[in-house]
A protein has these predicted regions:
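Compact, glycine-rich, soluble single-domain proteins
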Residues: 1-84
Length: 84
């Protein structure tokens, strides 16, 4: 069996490739914009930059290499795994 190392997007290391597995949406508090922006399960991503002082993270994702900024709190809802 393959061991999967789960992370939240907010804690994921910069410049490593990852895949979105799903969401931690207890109490249905996850912002709809996460899905509307295309951060869907099975999407491959990479964190390009993490602003200091818990500022936003800049994420590149998908085949078209879309880029967005997410607040750290928004990244708490997204469950990911690291790709080798």
């Amino acid at each position: 069996l393959k061991q999967i190392d789960l992370h939240k997007l907010s804690d994921f290391p910069k410049n490593k490739m990852g895949k979105i597995l799903g969401y931690d949406n207890d109490y249905l508090k996850m912002p709809n914009k996460i899905i509307e922006m295309g951060l869907l399960p099975e999407t491959i991503f990479r964190i390009l930059y993490q602003a200091p002082f818990n500022g936003p993270m800049y994420v590149e994702f998908g085949e078209e290499k879309s880029r967005i900024a997410l607040r750290k709190e928004e990244g708490e809802y997204i469950i990911v795994e690291e790709l080798n």
